[in-house]
Amino acid sequence: MSIQVFCDFDGTITNNDNIMSIMEKFAPPEAEEIKQKILSQELSIQEGVSQLFRLIPINLHDDIIQFLQETAEIRTGFHEFIQFINENNISFYVISGGMDFFVYPLLQEIIPKEQIYCNATDFSGEFVEVKWPHPCDEQCQHSCGLCKSSLIRKLSSKDDFHIVIGDSITDLQATKQADKVFARDFLITKCEENRIAYTPFETFHDVLAELKHLLEVKL
């Protein structure tokens, strides 16, 4: 049995949800209604996020990149967590509903690109179009966009010990496949609603301490 860690990006590795930060800064007011429909599950994640980015003109690309470079912050303890992961040969994947144009640059000096799974974007039209290279498999019908539960099935085996780290509705389906869940913010609410056991965290020092405990006691 091997340990497989699957970690969200926006609001988990980074302090803020970068998609929501982009929308608050650059999108028109109607983005807020779409956001609420995603959180309430009135809209699927795929449809909702597609609608959000179709509100963003492509000529804002450089402004968005500069904005994220100035505002995106990596959560405290993440570098130490990754160092421990690497030293102990634990498999680690970023499974992110975020977009390639900001996920890859923000992680380029920390995580190898081949360990990062995220959505793609097309800036060739008038507005940003999201592409979905990691859709739901036959076992998931939730229109996740980037389907985290499908990626877990693809990248690991049932015999592995699955750890999921996340913060929001986009991580909910993945938690249902996890042996251990680390949750913060809105994901805590969804775990409690669905009676999914979780460990709360605010920094990756919290996650690292619990992971060390798991290695010593359970695994």
From Swiss-Prot:
Its EC number is 3.1.3.87. GO terms for molecular function: 2-hydroxy-3-keto-5-methylthiopentenyl-1-phosphate phosphatase activity. It holds the Pfam family HAD. The keyword Hydrolase applies. It catalyses: 2-hydroxy-5-methylsulfanyl-3-oxopent-1-enyl phosphate + H2O = 1,2-dihydroxy-5-(methylsulfanyl)pent-1-en-3-one + phosphate. The keyword Aminoacyl-tRNA synthetase does not apply. One of its GO terms (biological process) is L-methionine salvage from methylthioadenosine. It is an enzyme of class 3 (hydrolase). Keywords: Amino-acid biosynthesis, Hydrolase, Methionine biosynthesis. It comes from the Bacteria. Pathway: Amino-acid biosynthesis; L-methionine biosynthesis via salvage pathway; L-methionine from S-methyl-5-thio-alpha-D-ribose 1-phosphate: step 4/6. Belongs to the HAD-like hydrolase superfamily. MtnX family. Dephosphorylates 2-hydroxy-3-keto-5-methylthiopentenyl-1-phosphate (HK-MTPenyl-1-P) yielding 1,2-dihydroxy-3-keto-5-methylthiopentene (DHK-MTPene). NCBIfam families: DKMTPPase-SF (TIGR01489), HAD-SF-IB (TIGR01488), PRK09552.1 (NF007103), salvage_mtnX (TIGR03333). This is 2-hydroxy-3-keto-5-methylthiopentenyl-1-phosphate phosphatase. It comes from Bacillus mycoides (strain KBAB4). The gene is mtnX.
